A protein has these predicted regions:
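N-acyltransferase acceptor-side catalytic subdomain
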Residues: 1-252
Length: 252
């Protein structure tokens, strides 16, 4: 193991500054298979563009990490999401060319949402009933959360990685955001609500946590008008990966 880290350190020192984020991904976070990190790093050591770095990394990761809790996080650090195909048990890695993110300098809460929050209709807590939120999201029409993926998220929750922001009304779970935390980033993967305004209050609360510094960045996935209301803006995949990795480094 010591020789692996020594090799990685030597490779890192030989790369241009602009590509160091790539190795930081593997050196600091791909804790499952450090030997794979070495082979991926060597194959991308002389890229003609940063886009080739990402492409090479994705080929290495996609061919190495089978669908698993560890593989989900490892590939997420390369801008890849693990999704299920509705109505089947199959899983696939999905790559988006752009990601919508909410950051402290962009976060905003619409006035109507602030008014809903002030009514105190809902109790908002983290991860009181994670499986309840997981099941609520899975019941949504055309949900990509297949049974095998549910098991992976349950394992991520046991590992302390997956979490859910939940809304309760009179003690009953009425809404939730499902996701996981990587460094300073909260990856919002799915959500549901069973009563009016629960989803709105959850979004307002999540955005407030970004504004207050509890969360460094929210990954919204693909941009939607609803996300933009809370300050979400689009960045290229490469910039998104850089931001996630930098958040991991700062969290250490």
């Amino acid at each position: 193991m010591r020789s692996v880290w020594k090799t990685l350190r030597a490779i890192k020192n030989g790369l241009k500054e602009g590509y160091r984020w790539f190795l930081q991904t593997f050196v600091l976070r791909l804790f499952v298979r450090p030997d794979v990190a070495v082979s991926c790093a060597f194959s991308a050591a002389r890229p003609s563009s940063s886009e080739k770095v990402v492409a090479t990394a994705m080929r290495c990761a996609a061919s190495t990490y089978l669908p698993s809790p560890e593989g989900l996080i490892a590939n997420y650090l390369l801008g890849m999401d693990l999704l299920g195909r509705h109505g089947t048990d199959s899983l696939e890695w999905k790559v988006y060319p752009e990601r919508a993110i909410i950051t402290p300098d962009s976060a905003k809460i619409p006035r109507s949402t602030k008014n809903y929050i002030k009514r105190n209709e809902f109790e908002i807590v983290w991860s009181r009933d994670f499986e309840g939120v997981l099941e609520g999201c899975q019941r949504q029409k055309w949900s990509w959360i297949t049974p095998p993926l549910m098991e992976i998220y349950k394992e991520l929750f046991k590992m302390g990685v997956a979490r859910s922001l939940e809304a309760y009304q009179e003690g009953r779970l009425v809404g939730g955001h499902l996701g996981f935390t990587v460094g300073h980033t909260f990856a919002g993967m799915s959500s549901f609500h069973a009563v009016d305004r629960a989803g709105t209050v959850l979004w307002g609360t999540l955005t407030r946590k970004v504004m207050d510094g509890e969360i460094g960045m929210v990954d919204c996935g693909e941009q939607k008008p609803h996300f933009a209301r809370y300050g979400a803006y689009v960045v290229p995949r490469e910039e998104f990966v850089q931001r996630v990795v930098q958040g991991v480094i700062r969290s250490k």
